[in-house]
Amino acid sequence: MLAKSLGWLLAVSRRNYCMGSRTALASRPWSKHLADPQIDPTAYVHSFANVVGDVRIQPGVSVAPGSSIRADEGTPFWIGGNVLIQHGVVIHGLETGRVLGDDDQEYSVWIGPGTCVAHLALVHGPVYLGANCFIGFRSTVLNARVGDGAVVMMHSLVQDVEIPPNKLVPSGAMITQQHQADSLPDVQAGDRHFVQQIAAMHGQSASPTQGTDPTVCVLPESLPAVTPVTETPYINSIDNMSINSDITNQIRSLLAQGYGIGAEHANERRFKTKSWQSCGTADGFRPDQVIATVEGWLQEFAGEYVRLIGIDQGAKRRVVEVIIQRPGDVPGSPSRGTTTTKALSSGGSGRSAVAHQTGNLAGDSANQLRALLHQGYKIGLEYASARRFKTGSWLTGGTIGSHREGEALQELNRFLADHTNEYVRIIGIDPAGKRRVAEIVVHRPNGNGNGKPSSSSSSVGYKSAPVSSAGGSSAGGLTPEVIATVRGLLANGHSIGTEHTDKRRFKAKSWDTCPTIDGGREAEVLAKLEACLADHAGEYVRIIGIDRVGKRRVLEQIIQRPGDNVVAGRSPSSSSASTSSSASSNGFGSGNGGGYSNSAVRLDNSVVTQVRSLLAQGYKIGTEHTDKRRFKAKSWQSCAPITSTHESEVLRALEGCLADHNGEYVRLLGIDPTAKRRVLETIIQRP
């Protein structure tokens, strides 16, 4: 009797639930005055999916529950054959903006056949997704075109760009500039295997068992018996790892950028001759799997040197080499760096907990010391009195024998305690090349260890960055915009260069090259940039992003101008630096549509409206300038070209142009790139 009652209640609940679903669908406000979806009979649309408007679903398509495909504003949508749309996917379009489909018709969203859109992804038109693409979990594709076979990994943003076919967008990447999209790596076999696993795993359970009407509520007549599943307990291998958190973060960062992980080992004799033997490469793409493989190498080659290799598989080159084990280290004890990391203060003196009370080492200097040790360099010590310091006469204080960070910092602090009233600097020594790679002043007689490198330091040496105060900007004198630019270039595997010029040569666009910035570590590059700004105070300085594989420039951005004040090693104020950094038209900014104006030069609202109108019509923007004498003769000179089509970047470039030619006439040009003619000439600045 009880079983019959329960069965009757279940049947009533099932009937009421299905009726409620149909009623809710009929009463939705956007379902009125819209075209009905065109769903192929062989396609499967779950009853809990929301499909509204002119959506054309082709054979073999699978739409999982919780998905929302709304063609209520931008229409129509085309979803090609055998497309897999997983749980929680949102597909929507703007009222304006269309893409050209493979059938030469205009669509708000086009999804090619065989494409997989994974859980919680957002595809917002106008968007074109080619055939056999993969859009990863929680990724966003907005106003973009993704070529056939491209793979967009998890938590990525693809906006306002065209991704070439068969390219890989790493997890967490923000691709908002076309030059970023052009430099993406190729999809590897491991990536294809991962995509096939995801598609196959969710495609097996997506085949329909009943009709494909999206308003039909499909519930099983009887629940299947629950089969006990033996779960494998998850063991966090990081608790017993033999590599410190810095190396773990390095591995995660390399994997997030799509790089492979390898390792090499050498005994003490081979290490002196730099004769390394390969440990192999780590299979898989999950950080825990790769970290476990690296730990296995450390256990296997205990008592030897082991270094980690980051591999760009597309360009077949190494992007990083870091020593993670030495003969004195014991695998399984994460002692490296734990004491010093805890002892160093992020905003103050950074005094070691076990050091002498008078030993004072700045946090930035400690980071540079750590970087030297990780690259296998020896550390030397030199000191000088105030009189000898003026003449550059340094006395040798010996070398630090230990290669462990904690012991090296303790020994350095003891040396500082013995020379409290003298200048002290550390020397980075390449034992194989028998040369100095860095000279960093870490202590001064007044107790301030944030000085500049001594006059005898080489051009490739490090510069000790000032320690920021509680309310100051980070990374010494560089602005957050410049730091973000450098970080983005390094993350994409590009090299960093600099150029400088004076006011006279700047007008003629004649730049002199600064010494090359070697190394791929962010702290080293930022320190050398600060040294370059200090060496060329009162001049224009611009940063260059260099694609070493293609041997081309991907970025030219001004980071210092003659009017900027450099005080105590600091670069210009944030407002002036913002103007400088945006003067280049192909900047490396995020381009997310935020506010454009951070500079002292503001564009008139009419100019902003004019620029917005030109860009909306597909025209390019250019500028010309002239002085009063040439203006009478109608003789204009072209400014730096503006290649970007993003409104915020164009406006920032215009502000930079006005600042560069203050006191002159500047006029705005609207250019039709197809007909190669000018459609607008208007003066936006007068003397």
From Swiss-Prot:
Bias kind Low complexity: ranges: 451-472, 568-587
Region feature (Disordered): 328-355, 442-476, 565-590
Annotated stretches, region: RbcS-like repeat 3, SSUL3: 480-562
Localisation: Carboxysome
Record region (RbcS-like repeat 4, SSUL4): 599-687
Keywords: Bacterial microcompartment, Carbon dioxide fixation, Carboxysome, Photosynthesis, Repeat
Domain notes: The N-terminus has a gamma-class carbonic anhydrase-like domain (CA), while the C-terminus has 4 repeats that are similar to the small subunit of RuBisCO (rbcS), called SSUL. The SSUL are connected by flexible linkers. The N-terminal domain forms a scaffold on which CA and other carboxysomal proteins assemble, while the C-terminus binds RuBisCO.
Protein name listed in UniProt: Carboxysome assembly protein CcmM
Source species: Synechocystis sp. (strain ATCC 27184 / PCC 6803 / Kazusa)
